[in-house]
A protein has these predicted regions:
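N-terminal helix-turn-helix
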Residues: 2-107, 114, 266, 270-274
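Short, solvent-exposed recognition segments
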Residues: 2-17, 145-218
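Amphipathic alpha-helical effector-binding/dimerization core
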Residues: 82-183
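Short, structured helix-loop boundary elements
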Residues: 27-31, 50, 85, 89, ...
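Extended hydrophobic
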Residues: 195-267, 281
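A structural signal for short hydrophobic beta-strand segments in well-ordered beta-sheet cores
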Residues: 77-79, 126-127, 229
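Cysteine/selenocysteine-centered motifs that mediate thiol-based redox chemistry or coordinate metal-sulfur cofactors
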Residues: 175-178, 182-184, 265-281
C-alpha cells in the first residue's frame, strides 16, 4: 500500500519590498536600543558594567555587547578597562553640545549669569524646557563651596525644580495638569511637592512675585531661586536661577535674591529681543 505523502507547501520567497520593510524594522529597533544604552550611560557618571547595563536597559547581554562595540568604534561610548565599566564617549558630548549651540542665546546669557553670580555670590544657571523636562544649558559657578547640582545637560522634573516652577507658572492650569498626568509628581526628597493642589498654590504665588523657589525639593540642603526669560511673543524662552546651600540661601535672603534674579531675567529678556508680559492687576 502506498503511503500518502504530505507535501509541505513551498514557502514563497519574500518580495524585495518585504525584505526592505524587514530591514527597516530591524534598523529602527537597533537604533532605539543603541540610544537607550547611551541615555542609560548618561544617567550615571560612575558608568556601568555590561551586566548592569543589560539589566537597566532590559536587553540581553549579547545584544548590549554587540551595540556597545559599534558605539565604541564611533566613539559614542568608551570602556574603562581598570574598572571594567562603560561610559559616555567624547562623540556623544560633541553631538550633545550642538543642542546648546542651537539655542544660540547661551553665549549671550553668560555675562548676565556672571552678573547674577557676582550680585548673589551663588551659582547662576541657564536652563530650558525640553520634552516637559528642565535641561541645564550652562552655568557660572559660585566661588563658595557647593554640593552637587544638576549636571549640564541633565534633566529634572519641572515640578521639582525652581526653574521648572517658574516656567509652569506661565502655563494654564490645564497645561500643568497635563504635565502632571504625563510625568507624575516624583518624591525626590522629604520636601518634594507631591500634591497637585499644593503645586497650584505655589504657582499662583510665583505669578504674583515673579520668581519661583525650590526649597530642598530636588536635593536636601540646596535651594534654588528662578525667573523666566521671555521671547518676543512674551512666551517662556528659558529661565535663569541661583542655586546654593540652605546655610547661605537663608529665609532672610530669599526676598532680596528673588528680586535680583527677577531683574536680571528681565534684563536678559530685553537683551535677547524678548518682551516681558504685561503685569496683570
Amino acid at each position: 500500500m502506498k503511503r500518502d505523502v504530505i507535501r509541505r507547501k513551498a514557502i514563497e520567497p519574500k518580495s524585495s519590498a518585504e525584505h526592505d520593510a524587514d530591514s527597516r524594522d530591524s534598523g529602527v529597533q537597533s537604533v532605539n536600543r543603541a540610544l537607550s544604552i547611551i541615555e542609560t550611560l548618561a544617567e550615571d557618571d560612575e558608568g556601568y558594567r555590561l551586566s548592569d547595563l543589560a539589566i537597566r536597559t532590559g536587553l540581553s547581554t549579547s545584544t548590549v555587547h554587540r551595540l556597545l562595540a559599534t558605539l565604541e568604534s564611533r566613539r559614542f561610548v568608551q570602556f574603562d578597562r581598570t574598572e571594567s565599566k562603560w561610559h559616555v564617549g567624547a562623540r556623544s558630548f560633541t553631538v550633545g553640545a550642538t543642542f546648546a549651540r542651537r539655542r544660540n542665546f547661551s553665549a549671550q546669557a553668560v555675562p548676565y549669569l556672571r552678573k547674577l553670580r557676582d550680585l548673589t555670590r551663588e551659582t547662576a544657571n541657564l536652563a530650558v524646557v525640553d520634552d516637559e523636562f528642565i535641561v541645564v544649558l550652562t552655568r557660572v559657578e559660585s566661588r563658595e563651596i557647593m554640593r552637587s547640582l544638576t549636571k549640564l545637560g541633565g534633566r529634572v522634573a519641572m515640578v521639582a525644580s525652581g526653574v521648572g516652577k517658574a516656567v509652569l507658572a506661565t502655563y494654564s492650569n490645564e497645561d500643568v495638569s497635563a504635565i502632571i498626568r504625563h510625568h507624575g509628581m516624583p518624591r525626590l526628597t522629604e520636601k518634594s511637592i507631591v500634591r497637585p493642589g499644593e503645586l497650584f498654590k505655589q504657582l499662583e504665588r510665583v505669578r504674583g512675585q515673579g520668581y519661583a523657589l525650590d526649597d530642598e525639593e530636588a536635593c536636601m540642603g540646596l535651594r534654588c531661586i528662578a525667573a523666566v526669560v521671555y521671547n518676543d511673543c512674551s512666551e517662556p524662552l528659558a529661565a535663569i536661577s541661583v542655586s546654593g546651600m540652605t546655610s547661605r540661601l537663608t529665609d532672610e535672603r530669599l526676598t532680596e535674591l528673588g528680586r535680583i534674579v527677577r531683574e536680571v531675567a528681565a534684563e536678559l529678556t530685553v537683551a535677547l529681543g524678548g518682551v516681558m508680559p504685561e503685569v496683570k492687576p
